[in-house]
Amino acid sequence: MINNLSILIPTYNNVCLELVKDLQVQASLLSDFSYEILVADDGSTDKMTVKENLAINDLENCRYIEREKNEGRAVIRNFLAKEAKYEWLLFIDSNMNVINSQHLRNYQMTEECGVIYGGYQVKRNQESLKHNLRYIFECKGIQNGDYKLRQANPYGDFHTSNFIIKRSIMLQYPLDERFRYYGYEDVLFGKTLKENHINISHIDNPLGYNHFIGNMTFVTKTEESLRTLYQFRDELQGYSKIITYASKIERWHLKTICQKLFPVLSLPIKARLTGNNPSIFLFNIYKLMYYIHLNTIYGVTNM
């Protein structure tokens, strides 16, 4: 049973006041339970967002921390872990929402484990989002809210949001701060936990995810994450299907063909992905070709 908790929310250009209010209400109603909610702003450039989030400081046991410089997902999470005062940490992304009034109680009553992951859930069949690539991508994939599927691959299906971890473990094995740009810091963290024999318990306690950026932005963020993957490809071997498929293409002596095709096919595929009829099949093809294309730019050395 978990009776103390530091709820840690990193944010960047996102208003998360309602999320904090929902969590604060739940925490305040739990018996024999000590808590704090820390929100760390990673150098937001949207001043109106910062202004709205300042109201978090008016809530009991809540604190909004402004940081001047954007330092990335790994640094901000490690910072929050150091700022926290309780034995247990709950990390939540600021663009998630509470969908269960017993969310914190479920964690409180869970059997203790080094890491506990609750997953996330996307509401399906939203007509207004049928042209949104990120939404389609989430719906086509394995639903992260299904804890039984996640438990079958406990380290591979782990994300650094909506998870509880002992503070001592987080401080001993912090996120790798070389990850300055978007993507894959959670994958390497899962690998670190596995290598150090730290168990992850997957439970049915999802948060909602309903923040679906536009198609162009999503493709751009995907490209950024693939550059991160390429940079850390040696350490992420065995933890990325893209690396696995790219290695097979190289063994089949098809890499040069893919590199030559990318300049020809990338623009029409990207136009389809950013339009009103995006295709997950083409999205997967684009990701693989873009990753292989990075070898043309950077060669055998890291970025």
Regions found by a protein language model. Give the residues of each.
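Glycine-rich, basic loop-to-helix element that forms the pyrophosphate-binding segment
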Residues: R67-A84
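Short aromatic/hydrophobic "clamp" motif used to bind/position activated sugar donors
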Residues: L89
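Active-site donor/metal-binding and catalytic loop motifs
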Residues: N196-R233
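Acidic donor-binding segment of Leloir-type glycosyltransferases
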Residues: L23-E66
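Non-catalytic, C-terminal membrane-associated alpha-helical segments of glycosyltransferases
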Residues: E224-R227, K241-M303
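Short, flexible, basic/aromatic active-site loop/helix in glycosyltransferases
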Residues: G119, Y135-Y155
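Acidic donor-binding loop at a coil-to-helix junction in glycosyltransferase catalytic cores
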Residues: Y181-F189
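Conserved donor NDP-sugar-binding/catalytic core segment of glycosyltransferases
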Residues: S101-N132
